[in-house]
Amino acid sequence: KATGGTYYALKDGQPTGCNPFQLPDSPKTREFIYRLVGICGKNAEGRVTAAEEKQIQLAVDTLMNTIDFENRNFSVLLQSIPPEPTKADNLRGRLSRWCRSEGGRYAWCLDNTSNDFDPDNFYRIGFDLTDILKDDYLPTEPVLAYLFFLRDLMMTRVAAAGGILATVIEEFWYPARFKITQDFMLKILKTDRKRAGWVILTSQSPEDAINCPIFSAIVQQTPTKIFLPNPDAQYERSYDQTGITQKEYDELVKLTLESRTFLIRQSRQSAFATLNLYGFDDEMAVLSGSSRNVAILDDIQDEMGDVSVDMWYPVFKDRVRQARQAKRQKAA
């Protein structure tokens, strides 16, 4: 947002502005929507039956072929799913959880009156998914899938224009839990570099990254790796799977967290580098967000509305400084 982009914080229980049925229609979009609706309609075993897949396909095709663009949504789609009153567990009942017309608990996720996310208009965009990324939480997988699909559409547009698209996936191991987002991530790694797309995958916990189901593919497809200090690290069954040598590891674990030094490894070459950002307090409030600073930004936006960065950023800096000073005085 500070560089002229758009920043969205998706909040649990609040309308996301996501409506996949109002994306531009194409065979690619339809295939994605079939799969997305199937994810929302999974039974207790985590799947839909072949007959249910057919119902989903017919319902999606009916919606996209016969309903005006502005009226396409999850609730209208549900009208094409036949009720099965003799079955306690049925597709219509499962999909009702995602529909406003049924008072569905998760209707805020994908059943919005309009789609606020047009990949043709994206330039720089960021999403805060802190509220959405939860274990055993039904909205996590479909919301992630939708955002990854938007990114895929954006990549197609940027590639056609001869541009470059950079993607940063924080805590990448979390979306890699799900098959649909695994597929998107592998596509990014394997094919998007040919379309001038590149990706940064980050994780605060090496163990979470290493336990990722597609970690071996990620290691093979990422030529450059950066390792931050981790004095408590282990080599065997941990860092040895990342491709660094024992010698590199031995030097890495000697580093303290305060050293500001890290290991860069590319192919068979490696080097240690230092990045000291002392004195960059104002900039760090933007480069590395915190819940406190995000709350400050939210308050400013509520007060000032959607104004240019030149107007809100000076106010943001002042309030962050005030909050920092108040914290220091309290600790003194």
Which residues does each predicted region cover?
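C-terminal regions of RecA-like/P-loop NTPase motor modules
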Residues: 209-332
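H-loop/switch region of ABC-family ATPase nucleotide-binding domains
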Residues: 203
